[in-house]
Regions:
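Positively charged n-region of N-terminal signal peptides that target proteins for export
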Residues: 1-5
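Short glycine/threonine-rich turn/loop motifs
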Residues: 276-384, 449-552, 557-560, 568-573, ...
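Mature extracytoplasmic or organellar-lumen-exposed domains after removal of signal/transit peptides
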Residues: 25-288
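Amphipathic alpha-helical interaction segments
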Residues: 66, 70, 329, 428-435, ...
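Soluble non-cytosolic domains of exported or imported proteins
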Residues: 38-42, 58, 62, 132-135, ...
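Extracytoplasmic redox metalloprotein regions
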Residues: 94-157, 161-162, 312, 316-320, ...
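Extracellular low-complexity, Gly/Ser/Thr-rich intrinsically disordered linkers
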Residues: 551-604
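Post-cleavage N-terminal segment of exported redox proteins
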Residues: 6, 10-12, 16-27, 228-306, ...
Length: 610
């Protein structure tokens, strides 16, 4: 009997083992994501091969353009994962069609490459050489995609928390860059491409909507995504697309759902310094950005004591050699921390500096300081200004002695830097003032309130202006939402500069390019000649005059400059102008609408200083 039991047990075990080999075990989520990614890459490869063959056979231009647009749609599906997990390759495949440099080697010029270059080729001037030029670009893209397909053990990297971060990133990228036409500047195929992005997001999310999720959550999110796709497919015209409606009715609730689903399932990234707060449920939330990322290390992080000390120093002329000017002399709170001059008055009270005084609001949210981007940290900027012979002609070394002689300041430094020895140092002076500047955060404008759900905060004219700003007027391709400065989404780690071709004066009969060479003075890279940091447009109503040299007194004048195509329209553009050369063809009514929108960026916090 015992042997019979053993025999039956042995047979059953064998059957179970065999069944185990016959019936595959359920795939882990990362493996399912990898399978989806593989299918997307296969589809993209097919489309790339198709357009390559069309070039070989010298198809008509119209058919080549169509195949290009089809290829882009396939790319956008795969890009949800490519952009996040392969950021370096993304810059190669889909970077701007502009020569660039790296910060650590500005002398080395990197030629543009990828889809945007191919778009310029296919949609630009056409001759017999176009086919071979286009094919070379196609092969380059094809080789990179091939590397993705051949990557060994690819599934391991698709960890749940990273995939959900990729989804958040894709939503921000589509909102800030996609529907603005940033990466489809000529073809203006951005709306169909956004639909492809949403389709991919939906496919990825459905892998995670298992029995552990409530049916209500799954159905609500899927319905939102499906409706978003339908809306995009039904409103493909780039210039007429209602971005305000799309963002508030689809982007915002979908983004919230993605964040909630990830958080409820514990798909959270490890706690460390990164630009975005992963718990923030809206792209337009006042808590979207993690302030610590844009601050010094913990040792020199802002505290209330340091902010208060910095505020006193900011308005105290003790840092200047002449004792008659402070930081607040040129950065007046009632003027949104600008001075109202074309360019700042020098310390001698007779001459003027080369450049306009920028606002300090939201200075924390930029990774480059000064119009020429010559330094990264606010502390270094402060030191530069204090020691500048035209600005304050001061000395932090001397200031340490003079502040130390003040019982009031000595006590305040002891309180603010209790763990430092000594407490009063050159760096601590700079850090205290920088702590105050970092506290100047303003993200509570009428526009922000509208995007957070209060539909009473913007009227029809302002909403039309926003849609123009994001579309036909191309403003948002440089002044990125939600900050409206040059901090590039969705990573928010790089602050861009642009070459606009700004004139020396408002003279229109014989305009002359402003001689200030911008970033070039410090990098000596020809790419940076006449390049200036993209400033924020928040509170722009209060910060006239405008441009790096203060050449324009009104927003109407600024809009006229851009409407003509910048320096190109004035026939003074340098060869490396980054602003698109063509006219915007905005009507007077449309210009008024864009300006009306920009005035909604005036912040309630800033107005308290008026």
């Amino acid at each position: 009997m015992r042997w019979s039991v053993y025999l039956i047990g042995f047979v059953l075990s064998g059957i179970i083992i065999c069944i185990g080999f016959i019936i595959p075990s359920p795939l882990f989520q990362n493996e399912k994501i990898d399978q989806l990614f593989g299918r997307q890459l296969d589809e993209l490869t097919t489309k790339i091969n198709d357009i390559e063959n069309a070039c070989n056979q010298k198809f008509k231009r119209r058919l080549l353009k169509k195949k290009f647009l089809d290829t882009r749609l396939s790319y956008k599906k795969a890009a949800v994962l490519i952009d996040y997990f392969h950021p370096f390759e993304t810059r190669l495949i889909n970077g701007a069609a502009l020569a660039r440099t790296e910060d650590d080697s500005p002398e080395k010029i990197v030629a543009p490459y990828g889809f945007q270059v191919l778009e310029e080729i296919l949609f630009g001037e056409w001759d017999d050489s176009t086919y071979s030029i286009a094919k070379a670009e196609i092969i380059g893209i094809k080789n990179i995609i091939s590397q993705f397909k051949q990557e060994p053990n690819r599934a391991y990297k698709f960890k749940n928390e990273l995939v959900f971060d990729a989804l958040r990133s894709a939503m921000i990228r589509m909102t800030a860059l996609g529907i603005s036409g940033f990466d489809s500047p000529i073809a203006e195929n951005s709306i169909p491409e956004a639909a492809a992005t949403v389709e991919s997001i939906q496919s990825i999310l459905n892998i995670y909507f298992t029995n552990n999720n409530s049916n209500a959550s799954k159905e609500t999110t899927n319905k939102l995504l499906s409706n978003a796709i339908d809306y995009l497919n039904s409103n493909k015209n780039f210039n007429r697309f209602d971005r305000a409606y799309f963002i508030t009715n689809y982007i915002n609730p979908v983004f919230t759902s993605i964040v909630k689903t990830g958080n409820e399932n514990g798909f959270l990234l490890p706690k460390e310094r990164r630009p975005l707060n992963q718990l923030s449920e809206s792209i337009f939330s006042d808590s979207l950005f993690d302030i610590s990322f844009y601050s010094p290390t913990e040792r020199y992080r802002s505290t209330s004591d340091r902010v208060q000390l910095g505020k006193l120093l900011f308005f105290d002329p003790i840092l200047s050699a002449t004792r008659d000017r402070s930081c607040g002399t040129c950065h007046k709170p009632e003027l949104a921390f600008t001075d109202g001059f074309k360019t700042a008055l020098a310390v001698d009270q007779k001459t003027y500096l080369l450049r306009n005084t920028p606002t300090l609001w939201n200075s924390i949210f930029q990774t480059k300081q000064f119009f020429d981007s010559r330094t990264a940290m606010l502390e270094h900027q402060l030191s530069d200004v204090v020691h500048n012979q035209e600005e304050m002609k001061g000395s932090l070394t001397r200031s340490v002695k003079e502040l130390g002689a003040s019982p009031k300041y000595a006590l305040l430094f002891q309180k603010a830097y209790a763990n430092e020895t000594p407490t009063l140092t050159e760096y601590n002076i700079a850090n205290a003032i920088s702590s105050y500047v970092r506290s100047l955060i303003a993200v509570n404008s009428r526009f922000d309130k509208y995007m957070r759900g209060d539909k009473t905060k913007m009227n029809k004219e302002e909403l039309k202006g926003f849609n123009l700003f994001m579309g036909k007027a191309k403003c948002a391709t440089c002044h990125f939402i939600p900050l409206f400065n040059g901090l590039v989404p969705p990573e928010f780690t790089e602050t861009e500069s642009e070459v606009l071709g700004v004139p020396k004066s408002k003279e229109t009969n014989a305009p002359v390019l402003d001689s200030d060479e911008g970033r070039f003075k410090f990098t000596r890279s020809i790419v940076h000649k006449y390049a200036f940091k993209t400033p924020t447009l928040r509170n722009i109503e209060l910060t006239a005059p405008y441009m790096h040299n203060g050449v324009y007194n009104t927003l109407e004048e600024v809009m006229d400059f851009y409407n003509k195509g910048g320096g190109s329209g004035l026939k003074i553009a340098p060869e490396n102008q980054t602003l698109p050369e063509g006219k915007l063809n905005l009507s007077k009514k449309e210009i008024r609408e864009v300006i009306a929108f920009m005035k909604t960026l005036t912040d309630s916090v800033v107005l308290k200083y008026k």
